[in-house]
A protein has these predicted regions:
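Aromatic- and acid-rich polysaccharide-binding/catalytic face
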Residues: 232-264, 391-408
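Hydrophobic alpha-helical membrane-insertion signals
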Residues: 204-216, 277-280, 293, 300-306
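Surface-exposed loop and turn segments in beta-propeller and other repeat-based domains
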Residues: 117-121
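Active-site "lid/cap" and pocket-lining segments within catalytic core domains
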Residues: 1-47, 147, 151-156, 162-248
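Aromatic, loop-rich ligand-recognition surfaces of beta-strand-rich domains
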Residues: 56-108, 113, 127-202, 301
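Catalytic grooves of carbohydrate-active enzymes
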Residues: 243-248, 256-281, 515-518, 522-539
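Carbohydrate-binding surfaces of carbohydrate-active enzymes
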Residues: 1-51, 65, 73, 81-83, ...
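Generic detection of short hydrophobic beta-strand segments and adjacent strand-loop junctions
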Residues: 115, 129-133, 213, 228-230
Length: 539
């Protein structure tokens, strides 16, 4: 039967949206979700537990708890669940540690799955998280949580280091099969998750290429959406309209430069950002003087989410991977195709292509620009925010750099230093820099002996050039404590009580150490394979 259907435009940011493809996928039944009665039950047994601290749901439906509890979804009729989408208001590691139980009668429960958090970066809030489970039909689903057994705070996962509290905006139970943690695997956000298991998504749940109909050429543009005019085979079909838009993510620490970032896969947009940023120092001054004075161009740690598409991505993918991505595009929405093994492989190829483009386009263009202006190129980490190989971009920079934190275990990520150090060793860079003593919620209690132990550790790891975070210009003579960066960073300026003697002695010590270290060359006795997973880091 020939039909004409108007298709609404998918969600867009920054008034930008462009279509990529339209697919028709056969479905057996409509995937209407059923309403459930939601109950939260506190399981704390200690006598000193305060009522305000037990599990509760606020007026907006956000569930909070600091004590063992469960969340129950009760359906009037048996409901088949294949995946659980976790929606958060912020970064909550504990929400991904739920134990899923199911029951037919509300009395006898069986284990469905213990959810396992993905390894995640500190900007983990850009996307929801979808956990696949074995197909389970039941009237009651319980999600148990306990702070016991929480990871004390592993690398990258800032939220795992915080006091274990549960905070969930919404749990969405879905009938349709989805790949486990597909949001990270599609390159939407920096995550490393377990592969989808066949008992969760079987061969019968995966679309074959022959089942999927590409309708991209059969729908026309309208001012308020798209209209599809097509004839589909008899049966029930789901239309999947796929497009690309801005992430909506803006950099947050750039002061006057706050705003959207350029397309990292397009050399023209990278060049434009450089021309309207760093090159302006030469355009608005005497260029000959600027060349003598301005000798370094620095790109700081990447803090603006990830990117997984642009207009040429499919072309680059085919050139680099040797096959056409377009027929498999539904995978980027988590829809399994061919088999879970094939689906995981193709999405890994997507992430590999992303990581290569970041280096071959963004960092290569900036390296060429720096050379054009007789500057050395300094750069910090791209992980754990942009989907990437955390070491690969250091081949393009002259001066690799990482960062280490002071008295901030919830934010310190030693891999930031290890990425820079290992990357420098691999690509033969003798100067290895560090943004040192970055701090959050500073309490004004730092002193040279405290700083020395931390600095010595990082010298031993492999750095040989220190940048103080933060040493800010303080223009005032009549204000105390003077210029700071609020609670961020070391208080290292002339109003520090030990400045006159301590700062000079400490700086001279650092200068002597790194002067000697820069004369040397690293002797690396062990090579460690970082694996084939993407994203990846030094450890």
């Amino acid at each position: 039967k020939r039909m004409a259907i108007r298709l609404p435009q998918p969600k867009a940011y920054e008034n930008y949206y462009e279509d990529i493809a339209l697919f028709a996928l056969p479905v057996e039944d409509a995937a209407d979700e059923m309403q459930a009665k939601i109950t939260c039950v506190n399981l704390a047994t200690t006598g000193n537990v305060k009522a305000a601290q037990t599990v509760n749901m606020d007026a907006a439906g956000v569930i909070r708890s600091s004590y063992p509890c469960y969340i129950q979804y009760e359906y009037e009729q048996p409901f088949t669940c294949r995946n659980i989408e976790i929606v958060l208001n912020g970064n909550n590691y504990q929400a991904h540690r739920l134990k899923v139980m199911a029951s037919d009668d509300g009395v006898n429960y069986r284990l469905v799955k213990q959810l396992v958090p993905a390894r995640q970066g500190w900007q983990n809030t850009d996307e929801n998280s979808t956990h696949s489970i074995p197909p389970t039909t039941a009237r009651f689903f319980r999600f148990y949580w306990t702070p016991e057994g929480s990871e004390p705070g592993s690398e990258d996962m800032d939220a795992a280091k915080w006091k274990p509290n549960l905070k969930i905006k919404e749990l969405r139970l879905h009938r349709e099969a989805r790949l486990n943690q597909w949001e990270g695997k599609a390159g939407l956000v920096w995550r490393v998750a377990q592969a989808t298991k066949e008992e969760e998504v079987g061969k019968q749940d995966c679309y074959s290429l022959s089942q999927v109909i590409n309708l991209t050429e059969q729908y026309t543009s309208h001012s308020n959406g798209k209209t599809l005019t097509a004839t589909l085979p008899k049966g029930k079909w789901k239309l999947l309209r796929m497009g690309h838009t801005a992430t909506g993510h803006t950099n947050a620490t750039a002061g006057g430069g706050k705003g959207l970032e350029c397309d990292k896969f397009n050399p023209k947009t990278v060049q434009k950002q450089f021309d309207n940023w760093f090159a302006q120092a030469f355009a608005k001054t005497n260029p000959e003087v600027a060349r003598r004075v301005l000798k370094y161009m620095h790109v700081d740690s990447w803090e603006c989410g990830s990117q997984n598409w642009n207009k040429r991505f499919a072309i680059e993918f085919q050139k680099r991977r040797g096959y056409d991505l377009m027929p498999y595009l539904p995978l980027l929405a988590g829809i399994p195709m061919e088999s879970v093994e094939q689906s995981e492989k193709i999405l890994r190829d997507v992430r590999t292509t992303i990581s290569e483009l970041v280096v071959d386009v963004f960092y290569q263009v900036l390296a060429d620009c720096a050379k054009e202006y007789d500057c050395q190129f300094s750069a910090e980490c791209v992980a754990p925010t942009m989907v990437s190989d955390g070491l690969l971009h250091y081949q393009k920079v002259d001066l690799p750099m990482g960062e280490f934190w002071l008295n901030s275990p919830t934010h310190d990520k030693p891999n930031d230093m290890l990425d820079a150090i290992s990357g420098a060793h691999i690509y033969g860079k003798n100067i290895i820099q560090a943004e040192g003593f970055t701090e959050v919620r500073g309490t004004w209690d730092e002193y040279p002996a405290m700083l020395k132990a931390l600095l010595d550790r990082n010298y031993a790891l492999g750095i040989n050039r220190l940048f103080y975070h933060v040493y800010v210009h303080n223009p005032w003579l009549d204000r105390q404590p003077g210029m700071t960066l609020d609670g961020i960073g070391l208080f290292f300026q002339r109003n520090q009580t030990w400045w006159d003697k301590g700062a000079k002695a400490f700086s001279e010590y650092a200068t002597r150490c790194q002067s000697l270290l820069q004369y040397g060359h690293p002797v690396t006795d062990i090579a460690v394979f970082t694996g084939e997973e993407v994203p990846r880091r030094s450890v």
